[in-house]
């Protein structure tokens, strides 16, 4: 009976360890999935992780946030906010975090409070640099304007993510 309980605990630990290991990239050991941005003005998106694979399309927006969903050697499988993606060489990606505004005329507040002074308004689709994030708000910088916006109005940051 005791041997069975010990075996059950060991199996549970192994399963938990295996599932934890799947949350990290096999190449970089960074969290998976994770957000990055497009470093280059253009980035070829390929069907597979090599130069021999066909280019399906080209990302053409520098600083566009992308979500890394897989790693293979020097290649990262990414997707954009519309779910489109493929394999991109890691040299075209940056760890600098950006987000896309998902709400038209999004107000940036001076503090993470809807009653705070309004600093600016951003149109839908604007790319902003991501700063610190609390439980509900993130600090953004876009076109020289700074302020706080609610996380649910942004693509490129997880709702549970906290950044300092």
Label each PLM-derived region with a short phrase.
Residues 54-55:
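Beta-strand-rich domains and repeat architectures in extracellular enzymes and scaffolds
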Residues 50:
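Intrinsically disordered, low-complexity polar regions and short flexible loop motifs
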Residues 1-9:
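Bacterial N-terminal signal peptides that target proteins for export
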Residues 16-19:
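N-terminal signal peptide c-region/cleavage motif recognized by signal peptidases
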Residues 21-47, 58-62, 69-84, 88-112, ...:
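SH3-family beta-barrel domains
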């Amino acid at each position: 009976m005791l041997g069975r309980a010990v075996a059950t605990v060991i199996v549970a630990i192994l399963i938990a360890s295996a599932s934890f290991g799947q949350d990290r990239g096999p190449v970089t050991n960074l969290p998976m999935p994770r957000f990055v941005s497009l470093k280059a003005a253009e980035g070829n998106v390929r069907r597979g992780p090599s130069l021999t694979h066909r280019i399906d399309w080209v990302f053409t927006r520098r600083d566009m946030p992308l979500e890394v969903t897989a790693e293979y050697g020097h290649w990262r499988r990414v997707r954009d906010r519309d779910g489109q993606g493929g394999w991109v060489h890691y040299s075209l990606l940056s760890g600098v975090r950006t987000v896309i505004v998902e709400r038209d005329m999004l107000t940036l507040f001076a503090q993470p409070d809807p009653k705070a002074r309004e600093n600016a308004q951003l149109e839908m689709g604007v790319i902003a640099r991501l700063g610190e994030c609390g439980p509900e708000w993130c600090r953004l910088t876009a076109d020289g304007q700074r302020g706080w916006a609610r996380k649910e109005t942004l693509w490129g940051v997880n709702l549970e993510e906290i950044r300092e």
